Amino acid sequence: MSRTVFCARLQKDAEGLDFQLYPGDLGKRIFDNVSKEAWGQWQSKQTMLINEKKLNMMDPEHRKLLETEMVNFLFEGKDVVIDGYTPPSE
């Protein structure tokens, strides 16, 4: 049976994550307040950030930058801005 959460990103009730995907208190906050849909959106943005900014996940500063962007995206409603990227027009 799926869980329902009030998603902080989407501002609506939606299907929650199946398990905690991120460690610590932030992971618990994500599990309790972020939907599968919003997490999927974040994963796409995260991939773009890692590739475009050439982030190395072995570097603690790069991991901290990615975590900050994640919190901004999931909880503060800020979109990820990547210099030089123009989203495709619909």
UniProtKB/Swiss-Prot annotation:
One of its GO terms (biological process) is cellular response to oxidative stress. Coiled coil: none annotated. GO terms for molecular function: iron ion binding. Gene3D superfamilies: Fe(II) trafficking protein YggX (1.10.3880.10). It comes from the Bacteria. Keywords: Iron. The keyword Zinc does not apply. The keyword Repeat does not apply. GO terms for cellular component: cytosol. Pfam families: Iron_traffic (PF04362). Belongs to the Fe(2+)-trafficking protein family. Could be a mediator in iron transactions between iron acquisition and iron-requiring processes, such as synthesis and/or repair of Fe-S clusters in biosynthetic enzymes. This is Probable Fe(2+)-trafficking protein. It comes from Vibrio atlanticus (strain LGP32). The lineage of its organism: Bacteria, Pseudomonadati, Pseudomonadota, Gammaproteobacteria, Vibrionales.
